[in-house]
Amino acid sequence: MSTQMRKIIHIDMDCFYAAVEMRDNPNFRSRPLAVGGHEKQRGVISTCNYEARKFGVRSAMPTAQALKLCPSLLVVPGRMQVYKEVSTHIRSIFSRYTHLIEPLSLDEAYLDVTDSTQCHGSATLIAEAIRRDIWNELQLTASAGVAPIKFLAKVASDMNKPNGQFVIPPEQVQSVIDTLPLQKIPGVGKVSLEKLNQAGLYVCQDVKNSDYRQLLKQFGRLGASLWQRSHGIDEREVIVERERKSVGVERTFTQNIVTYEQCWQVIEEKLFPELAIRLEKANPEKAIIKQGIKMKFADFQLTTIEHVHHELELAYFRELLQDILQRQKGREIRLLGLSVMLKPEEQARQLSLL
């Protein structure tokens, strides 16, 4: 386990967009609600309240599918400018307690309060104070996780949702990690989890007891990362004012695909909606300069293609898909990904002065 013990808080707003809508319109509070696009325009759900989640509605789900699961679902369009203003207010609350703030999206952030003198230096009390300030000033709830390392703080913030917090003190880190299901580790998706389970790995203790070289051989970079996490090692620092250069999503298939039609179905129904939501949460106003597609074949050869394009446009991914499939040469496809490259802030400022 890492000997450097810090005080890390992960704050995650509860169903943020939907919560803002319910706050501003009391009639929405007692019914299933989602923020998203219209079903006739092949829209997707950005987020939904907990009432809607009882019916199986989830973010990145096509609106048409969500309405089948929950016919009484009210779907309202997003108000990104409002959400951004609320997010700015939330970050101003964070800054009262520490200057070490790493925003992950409009509704989520890491805070390092190791050297903070607020609340007698107690990370637990600071998390409580932040959540109280958010409620008193914005009438919104937040959940928090407190731990000595980043990944565990993020895991902890999900343990007492909504409107709660969970604290993992240093002396309990390893005991909590040992029983932690691998699907709770950030970065472990459905396909990775299936492969881990096939290897007899279900909780972190299984990984901790495994041979490092064998993990590296079987699972590559993921195996190395899981070995570290399972031993309580996460030396990543809270990065202040991190500028995001790109946003991407990808899907590894349990069964390889081959045809253009299969690829396009994945892009249209899964990847593009997920990318749109991720981009929206990361920074809805930041300019796009490129769109790209990544493809990995059954022989593990990876290829990417990207072209200059200044809008997030589904039709343009169709052109990129046609281009990248020229490199397929009959091979099956095991991974497909979409990405957008964002304009650097400095470049954007320079252009605005011209």
Swiss-Prot record:
Domain spans labelled UmuC: 8-189
Domain of life: Bacteria
Enzyme class: transferase
Molecular function terms from GO: damaged DNA binding; DNA-directed DNA polymerase activity; magnesium ion binding
CDD domains: PolY_Pol_IV_kappa
Ranges that cross the membrane: none
Any coiled-coil regions, as ranges: none
KW Magnesium (keyword) present: yes
A Gene Ontology term for the protein's cellular component: cytosol
Residues involved in Mg(2+) binding: 12, 107
Localization, UniProt: Cytoplasm
One GO process term, biological-process aspect: DNA-templated DNA replication
Cofactor binding, note field: Binds 2 magnesium ions per subunit.
Cofactor field: Mg(2+)
HAMAP family, per the entry: DNApol_IV
Family: Belongs to the DNA polymerase type-Y family.
Role played: Poorly processive, error-prone DNA polymerase involved in untargeted mutagenesis. Copies undamaged DNA at stalled replication forks, which arise in vivo from mismatched or misaligned primer ends. These misaligned primers can be extended by PolIV. Exhibits no 3'-5' exonuclease (proofreading) activity. May be involved in translesional synthesis, in conjunction with the beta clamp from PolIII.
Name under which the protein is recorded: DNA polymerase IV
